[in-house]
Amino acid sequence: MSIYHDEVEIEDFEYDEEEEMYYYPCPCGDRFQISKEELIEGEEVATCPSCSLVIKVIYDPEMFKAEEDEESALNEKLGDLKLEKN
């Protein structure tokens, strides 16, 4: 079992859309980080690349599952449209 420095709600993280990463300030001066992909897979621990601290991320896994399902449906529709054009 991990010992968490803190428990932080996902809403308190900063989201970088380009990198699809969530960031939260670490006491060491760097930032805790966790990727959107890790959250979709059910990961709940954000790590700091500069020190040994970890935090538990509080979030609703269903929120990310629904978003993943939406993306899959959109990609499928785009694929169908490309086939229709040819």
UniProtKB/Swiss-Prot annotation:
From the broadest rank down, the organism's phylogenetic lineage runs: Eukaryota, Metazoa, Ecdysozoa, Arthropoda, Hexapoda
| Protein name stated in the entry | Diphthamide biosynthesis protein 3
Annotated Gene Ontology cellular components are: cytosol; nucleus
Assembly with partners or alone:
Component of the 2-(3-amino-3-carboxypropyl)histidine synthase complex composed of Dph1, Dph2, Dph3 and a NADH-dependent reductase.
Pathway the protein takes part in = Protein modification; peptidyl-diphthamide biosynthesis
Q: Which cofactor does it need?
A: Fe(2+)
Q: Which family does it belong to?
A: Belongs to the DPH3 family.
Catalytic activities: [3Fe-4S](1+)-[protein] + Fe(2+)-[Dph3] = [3Fe-4S](0)-[protein] + Fe(3+)-[Dph3]; 2 [3Fe-4S](0)-[protein] + 2 Fe(2+)-[Dph3] + NADH = 2 [4Fe-4S](1+)-[protein] + 2 [Dph3] + NAD(+) + H(+)
Q: Which GO terms describe its molecular function?
A: ferrous iron binding; iron chaperone activity; oxidoreductase activity
UniProt key word Oxidoreductase: yes
What range(s) does the DPH-type MB domain occupy?
4-60
Give residues annotated as binding Fe cation: 26, 28, 48, 51
PANTHER family, per this entry? DIPHTHAMIDE BIOSYNTHESIS PROTEIN 3, DPH3 HOMOLOG-RELATED
What keywords is this UniProt entry annotated with? Answer: Iron, Metal-binding, Oxidoreductase
Q: Name one Pfam family in it.
A: Zn_ribbon_CSL
Q: What does this protein do?
A: Required for the first step of diphthamide biosynthesis, a post-translational modification of histidine which occurs in elongation factor 2. Dph1 and Dph2 transfer a 3-amino-3-carboxypropyl (ACP) group from S-adenosyl-L-methionine (SAM) to a histidine residue, the reaction is assisted by a reduction system comprising Dph3 and a NADH-dependent reductase. Acts as an electron donor to reduce the Fe-S cluster in Dph1-Dph2 keeping the [4Fe-4S] clusters in the active and reduced state.
